[in-house]
Amino acid sequence: MIQYVKRSCALGLLALASAATLAQQNPKPVDTQPVTSTHIIGAAKLIIGDVKQNQAFYEQMFGMKEVSHYSAKDVYDEPIMGFSEGARLALFSPLAEAPIKKSQFPVALIYTPDFEGVVSRIEAAKHPVTRLPTAQSGTFKIAIARDPSGNAIEIFSRPTGILEVGGSKLIVDDRQKAEDFYAKVFGAKPGQRYNTAAYDEVLMQFGAGPFLALFQPKAEAPLPKSQFPVVAIYTSDFDGVLKRVTEIGLGYRDVKSSSPDTRIIIAKDPAGNSVEIIRRAPAAAAKK
């Protein structure tokens, strides 16, 4: 795991996050990211348990603030967390789905210019966190923390940058199949690759926005997947994306939205990860 984090975070420097926001099921999604590509990673989505406990963790440890909040009675409760800029972190609490076992590997990456301050707060609060030794991290300062629901979060020091969510990380059971899926559906381009005795990973690039890491553990058996999304992707080519998702045949479901100009589907990737795909109207985006 230590070796994985070293390589993955070093790569993260090549995939700096720009502005994005999350949309969720009921209201019209709030889209604040400048248009830089057809498809954009809007948010990393974490499956959590207790909302107040997990929200407090991200507020107190990282200084994140709630920017939106969505819910559906007896189905889910979801605060949307964000920094002043960049992609969002959605804390999704299913109300009728049993807790699932979490991977030992990170599912999101956060950049910080105050690495020592952030990690020290987490240590003082007695939350699980591991600093990588210099022998493993090289010139980088890296730590892995776990939120109250057990999600592993990669913390990467970027002294000249700002606090922001740098990428979403999906655990897959076949990196090549997953890569082919995201390349075909979204035209995502593979960036850095890492293949060791412990894992096989590629970072998929979505324009100037956050990266999407596809991480295949070689010593961790595939774990159960939630029926709910673990990443949200905006697209201005919704019809084209839907056509390609349909052709691949892994299935999708429509999600109702109260806004007539918004359409959302949840598709399955080859690993069984649920992917939220949100229509981003070209005409509306052009007004930004």
Regions flagged by a language model, labelled:
Residues V35-H39, K45-R88, K169-L212, R263:
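Core segments of cupin and vicinal oxygen chelate
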Residues L14-L22:
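Hydrophobic h-region of N-terminal signal peptides that target proteins for export
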Residues G86-A90, I100, G150-I153, G209-A213, ...:
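Short, charged/polar, Gly/Pro-enriched secondary-structure boundary elements
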